[in-house]
Amino acid sequence: MSSATPAAAAPDTVLVVDFGAQYAQLIARRVREARVYSEIVPSSMPVEEILAKNPAAIILSGGPSSVYEAGAPTLDRSLFEAGVPVFGMCYGFQLMAQTLGGTVDNSGAREYGRTELAVSKPSSTLFEGTPAEQSVWMSHGDACSAAPEGFTVTGSTDVVPVAAFENDEKKLYGVQYHPEVMHSTHGQQVLEHFLYRGAGLSPDWTTGNVIEEQVAAIRAQVGDRRAICGLSGGVDSAVAAALVQKAIGSQLTCVYVDHGLMRKGETEQVEKDFVAATGVQLKVVDASERFLGALAGVSDPEQKRKIIGREFIRVFEQAQLEIMREDGPEVAFLVQGTLYPDVVESGGGTGTANIKSHHNVGGLPDDIEFELVEPLRQLFKDEVRMVGQELGLPDEIVQRQPFPGPGLGIRIVGEVTKERLDLLREADAIAREELTAAGLDRDIWQCPVVLLADVRSVGVQGDGRTYGHPIVLRPVSSEDAMTADWSRLPYEVLSKISTRITNEVTDVNRVVLDVTSKPPGTIEWE
C-alpha cells in the first residue's frame, strides 16, 4: 500500500507538541479556528526534527506528568533558543519555566477546574484587551513560583504566584491554565494574541486555501492516470470525491459498494443526492451477500472491521477491472475520506496508542493494489463540512450526521446477520425520524443506535412475557469527534423513540440511553 496524498506545504504552520494532553487535538483546532494552519507532533520527536519542519510557531501542550517525575517528557533547551515563537500551556508552561531556570514547586498547591486569574500587566502581548480578572480552567498539581530570568510575570491566582509569563524579546510565552477550553472565558483571545502579536502570523488559512492546495497536490500525485473513490453516503467520502473530481475531472469514477450494512433508504439517497450534486460517474456494486458471508460467525469488533476493510478493497479491485474493460486505462488510485481524528485514533501522527483500527487507516490489507489519495487527512470534521460548502455540495450531504464506513456492522454487538440488520435498521429509522421531527438534527453530533444482539432481557407486552433484545441510544454532542459528551435530549423525545421502537420493532423490548462521555468511552460501541 503506497503512501497517501502528500500534504501541500503551508506557508505558516504552528506545531503543537503533544505531551499526552487530553486536549492536544483541541489546541490544534483552536489554532485553525484562528485561521492559522496547525499540526500535532509527539513530544518524543527530537528538537532538530521539530525545527526541521520549519514551524512558524510552536505550542507546548499540557500533559498528565509532573516535571519532577522520573521519565517525564522533556525538551532540549535549544528549542527555546532557536528564535521560533513558543507558547507553553499547563505542563508545557512548567517545562519551559524549569528548562530556562525558573522555579517549579511540587508544593501541593493544586488547582482543578474554574479559577480566577488576576492579570498583572493588562497591556502585555497575551492579555491586552482582556479583563484584569478572568475565569480560566486549571488542571495542575505543581506550580511555578519564580519565572526564568528575562520573563515578566503577567498573571497569578490566589494559589499560584506565577500563572502567566512573557518574554517579548525571545518570543517565549506561557500560561499555567488551558486557554483552549471554553471554560477559559478569554482563552481564544489569548491564543490569537500569541499567534498574531507574539508570533506575527496572519489569519490567512481558509477553506479556499485548502481546496487550492489539495487540488494541486492531487494533480501532482495522480497525473494523467485514473482514480476510483468509494462513496459511503457520508460527508467525508463525498467531499473527498468532490475535491478529487475538481482536480482530475473525468479521470475519477466513484464506486458505491452496497455492503448490506447501510441504514434504511441510504443506498437510494446516495445514488440520487451525490450524482445530482456533482454529475460524477457512479458505479453501484451490490455486494451485500459477499459481506454477510464473510462476517458469518464473527463477533469480535476488531475482526469485523478488518473483514469489512478487506472485502471493501476486494470489491474495489473487481470494480477496477470492470471499469478498465469498459473504459480502457488502468485505475491506479483509491480515494479515501480519511480525517485527522482517524489518523490520531489509529495511533498515527502523535505516537499515541492505537485506540481501534479505523476503517480508513488500519483496516486495509497490506497487499492493496491501489495508491491511496487522502485529501482530507489533515482536516477535522467541521473543516470538511466547510470545504464541502465551498465546493457547492448541498446541505443534505454536507450536514449529514457522521456514520462509520463499516456501517451497521459495528453497531451490532455480536454476530452480524440479515435478521439482526433488518431489526436494527427499523430501530435506527425510528430514532432518526423522531430526532428530525423534533428539530434536533443540528443540535447533536450523531446518534448511533446499537443492537445488543447477544443480550436478552425479560419484558411484559400485552398479557405475555417477552425475552427480547435491548436497543441502545447513543446521542452525543461534539465539535470534532476527538472528545464528546452525551446529549441531553428532551424526555418527551426519548419517550416517543422508546415507545415506537418497542411497539414497532419485533424482538425488541427495552431501550436504554448511553450517558458516557468520550473519554472514557468512544462514540461507537465497536
From Swiss-Prot:
Keywords: ATP-binding, Glutamine amidotransferase, GMP biosynthesis, Ligase, Nucleotide-binding, Purine biosynthesis. It catalyses: XMP + L-glutamine + ATP + H2O = GMP + L-glutamate + AMP + diphosphate + 2 H(+). Residues 13-204 form the Glutamine amidotransferase type-1 domain. InterPro entries: Class_I_gatase-like, GATASE, GMP_synth_C, GMP_synth_GATase, GMP_synthase, GMPS_ATP_PPase_dom, NAD/GMP_synthase, Rossmann-like_a/b/a_fold. Its EC number is 6.3.5.2. It is an enzyme of class 6 (ligase). One of its GO terms (molecular function) is GMP synthase activity. GO terms for biological process: GMP biosynthetic process. The keyword Metal-binding does not apply. Catalyzes the synthesis of GMP from XMP. This is GMP synthase [glutamine-hydrolyzing]. It comes from Streptomyces coelicolor (strain ATCC BAA-471 / A3(2) / M145). The gene is guaA.
